[in-house]
Amino acid sequence: MQIAKATAPYYDKKRSKKPLILSKSLPHFRTVLTRAQNVDVAIDNSEFSYLPAQAEALGVPLPPVERIALRLSDGRTLSALRFGTGSPEVTLLHGAGLNAHTWDTTALALQRPLLAIDLAGHGDSSWREDADYAPRTLADDVVEALDAWTTQPQLLVGQSLGGLTGAALAATRPDLVSELVVVDITPGVDVSAGPAALRAFYAGPTDFASRGELVEKAMSLGFGGTRAETERGVFLNTRVRADGRVEWKHHFAHLAAQALAAHDPGDSAAPSALHETGWDDLASVTAPITLVRAARGFVSENDAVEFQRRLPDAHVAVLDATHNVQETAPVALAALLASTPARGI
């Protein structure tokens, strides 16, 4: 297996050797979050260009950050971001349609050596020709990555699709996982359709004349927050093709029309194919499990009750956030991840 590295041009050599203590009040978290996410930085040709301003807004040193890639056993490539020095202690898995950069602010706040992985079909990782993005399939890739890139069991954190992928991994390779944190997803939640505005966003064309066109479309549908936040999200989740057209990096956008046509919005009980095996995987996990429910996300109070009924030893925490907790409450999420001494961070 081959590993390729591309080192970020920005880092602080005076990185603190001590963990960041995030035990202040939630109002402070909200203030820091506002500063970190509302910094208006110019889009350039570097995926790392946003990090210095984000770290400055948080008041933390910017660790070394690099993009790494692994040639998988079947010839595909799995890509990731590595934050910090030393062996990774934490691995972060994003949700459908996102990429490793969704964790940037959380990773900076946590200040620990970690990996943020682009799942297959997302970011800089290869698309699958069979379009199989079931959690167990995705977990096989992450297993190869952790075998290659880590030397100790991981605090494995997965949001949405990444959470179910983490459960599948923890069930089959308990030696790789010290603790599993599942963010705003349970196997009983069907997120395949998503909000109506999200369906409208992906139901249109798959390529565009410019990133600016996508920014305008996203903002017209209420996505992305401020213009600066929307520009950052679009820049980090798109690429410019050889013909000059802009397309989403993730395969899901290109599969959206077919998936949306197959979904019956009138059948609320229709199970998502991605989640059918999730309960079995979670029941097989031997590591401690925490469910993080977003108060304004996809997991309801009843879903959380069912989660604890099936997994009585699991812990459930609630954060004031929307579904993408790592983007709307990243500092509070980092505080939660750092709050238990048993996690060793």
Role assignments for model-derived ranges:
Residues M1, Y10-Y11, K17-P88, Q111-R112, ...:
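Alpha/beta-hydrolase fold catalytic core
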Residues R76, L81-D124:
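Conserved HGGG/HGGXW glycine-rich cap/lid loop of the alpha/beta-hydrolase fold
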Residues G244-R309:
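Conserved serine/cysteine hydrolase catalytic core
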Residues G158, G162, G166:
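Gly/Ala-rich beta-loop-alpha elbow adjacent to hydrolase catalytic centers
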Residues A171, S178-G212:
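Flexible "cap/lid" loop of the alpha/beta hydrolase fold
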Residues S73-R76, L119-V157, A335:
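Active-site loop/oxyanion-hole signature of alpha/beta-hydrolase fold enzymes
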Residues T322-P330:
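Catalytic histidine-centered segment of alpha/beta-hydrolase-like enzymes
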Residues A209-D264:
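Conserved alpha/beta-hydrolase catalytic His-Asp/Glu region
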